[in-house]
Amino acid sequence: GQRNNLEIINIFTEAGKINENAPKHYVGLDRSEARKQILKELKDKEFFEKEENIKNKVPYGDRSNSIIEPFLTEQWFADAGKLSVKAKEVVNSKKTNFFPENWSKTYFQWMNNIEPWCISRQLWWGHQIPAWYGPDNKIFVAYNEDEAKQLANKHYGKDVELNRDPDVLDTWFSSGLWPFATLGWPDDKKFVEKFYPTSVLVTGFDIIFFWVARMIMFGTEFLNKEPFKDIYVHALVR
């Protein structure tokens, strides 16, 4: 679809039923029933060419054992490419070192091919995204609700009701803040100034990108300083 510049249209509700973007006689049908109806209509109108069995990998939920259906939704993304610039520089300049050194190749393999990072998750635990929506869905990103209300009041010229985004941050986003958030940042910088950066991080090779890279990205972005000098990478017990 994107190769042919087609519009991206979501036809499902969150319950897996057909929404109003589809022809009216399909709206409200379960996705499996809609497939049957569409197939019948193609045959009735003599647009159907052939039917054959094919092998396909169909994803199932590990708890529900239900088929996982691709579903288009709006999400929050971080510009990881921009965040990676300083993070690559501190390793290139040996301000931060990997031991064994060969693990830096894994680090750069990820960082040199980095893509926009989807940071929002539809879960019921985690740091809630600090964004509020006005009556016309205008977004106000703020430190807290009071600050969001002030921004909204200035924008609309009156008090309005705001609704907070229900999504939470990706757990690796929260984990990436760990080196300085645990020290009281951003409200209290006393311990940050005393204990940041630290000297050594010991971790497994499986989370070099998921955790190590994110800590370096956030440390260099928010504090302009790498969070640790040496990274000792160990194997895993499987």
Residues covered by each model-derived region:
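Surface-exposed, flexible loop/turn segments at secondary-structure boundaries
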Residues: 16-17, 215
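Active-site cavity-forming subdomains of large catalytic enzyme subunits
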Residues: 16, 38, 61
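A short-motif feature that recognizes glycine-rich, charge-decorated loops
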Residues: 17-33
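Phosphate/diphosphate-binding loops
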Residues: 30-58
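Structured secondary-structure scaffolds
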Residues: 2-11, 50-238
